[in-house]
């Protein structure tokens, strides 16, 4: 999914935090219009910094996103919104097109 995004038109102005420390990511996150990623600490940090977050919920319960209106979620295909659990294990069922579509809605 990440490689599809990086190679898309939307991905040309994005980069991954995979080799950065949390502290190194803070100024980048704060200056973003939108955070896109799975339900991890970086998404929650983005929300704490008042940045909209599109969180990919592969196997995270809805309660992890319900605390802020800045969070929009994408669930695996075939899973009803808000019905993911720790046992969903849906990372291979997340639609790139759905993530891209939701991303474009949130930045426009």
Segments (PLM) and residue ranges:
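Nucleotide-sugar donor-binding patch of glycosyltransferase catalytic domains
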Residues: 44-107
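Donor-binding and catalytic core of enzymes assembling or modifying cell-surface/extracellular glycoconjugates
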Residues: 1-58
């Amino acid at each position: 999914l990440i490689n599809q995004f990086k190679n898309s038109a939307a991905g040309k102005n994005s980069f991954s935090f995979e080799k950065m420390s949390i502290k190194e990511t803070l100024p980048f996150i704060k200056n973003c219009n939108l955070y896109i990623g799975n339900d991890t600490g970086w998404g929650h940090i983005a929300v704490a910094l008042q940045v909209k977050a599109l969180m990919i919920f592969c196997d995270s319960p809805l309660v992890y996103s319900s605390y802020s209106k800045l969070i929009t979620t994408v669930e695996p295909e075939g899973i009803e919104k808000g019905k993911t659990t720790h046992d969903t294990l849906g990372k291979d069922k997340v639609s790139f097109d759905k993530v891209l579509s939701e991303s474009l809605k949130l930045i426009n």
